[in-house]
């Protein structure tokens, strides 16, 4: 609904993020059909993180499928079928995204994962937020064989607390010591500066 409101009221192109953590396959299918009905066609498929490190650590996860299963659900809907094999009134027209992890410890394994995601229906890749440009360059080079757009993620840091949380708690996000030091000294202002600097450097990759 937020994606729809931004597109409808603000004319901002959105990418609807959908994870497997909170819904079974019927719920995931329902979310996707609802998005299609609202004209939200760009989606990012994610497995999702367990709630352990969030503000609702007591919540139960679902994970009936992972991101590969969610990709297949979207691909099936695009082919005009639901999960039970019934014909839809019209096929959906999702532009399907998958995640990439430049911070993965083994980029060859990451390459194999991306190949499988593309085979399962991914049209584009959106990475975890980038805070290490050399890491991003290595990732782009490793994935150069794939003929799909790769969007490098960028999230401005608001505080040193946020920076340390991302660095220590979120898999695949690695901040350099230089960035951590700058955030400790400069807070939100430093985070804005880092985001602008990173964006300018990303444009050159």
Please give the residue ranges for each predicted region.
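Catalytic cores of alpha/beta
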Residues: 24-36, 108-115, 137-141, 160-162, ...
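Active-site-adjacent beta->alpha loops and helix N-cap segments on the catalytic face
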Residues: 1-5, 24-30, 50-87, 106-109, ...
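Active-site pocket-lining/capping segments in soluble small-molecule metabolic enzymes
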Residues: 48, 61-89, 99-104, 145-197
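Short, well-ordered coil/turn segments that N-cap beta-strands
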Residues: 10-14, 39-41, 90-96, 122-123, ...
């Amino acid at each position: 609904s937020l994606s729809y409101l931004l597109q409808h009221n603000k004319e901002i192109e959105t990418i609807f993020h959908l994870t497997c953590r909170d819904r079974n396959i019927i719920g995931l299918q329902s979310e996707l059909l609802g998005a299609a009905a609202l004209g939200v066609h760009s989606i990012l498929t994610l497995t999702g993180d367990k709630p352990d490190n969030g503000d609702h650590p007591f919540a139960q996860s679902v994970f009936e499928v992972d991101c590969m299963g969610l990709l297949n659900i979207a691909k099936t809907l695009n082919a005009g079928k639901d999960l039970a094999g019934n014909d839809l009134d019209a096929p959906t027209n999702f532009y399907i995204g998958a995640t990439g992890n430049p911070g993965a410890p083994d980029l060859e394994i990451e390459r194999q994962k991306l190949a499988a995601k593309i085979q399962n229906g991914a049209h584009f890749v959106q990475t975890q937020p980038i805070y290490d440009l050399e890491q991003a360059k290595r990732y782009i080079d490793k994935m150069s064989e794939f003929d799909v757009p790769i969007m490098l993620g960028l999230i401005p840091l608001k505080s040193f607390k946020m920076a340390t949380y991302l660095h220590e708690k979120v898999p695949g996000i690695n901040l350099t010591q230089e960035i951590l030091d700058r955030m400790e000294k400069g807070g939100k202002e430093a985070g804005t500066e880092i985001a602008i600097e990173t964006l300018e450097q990303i444009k050159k990759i």
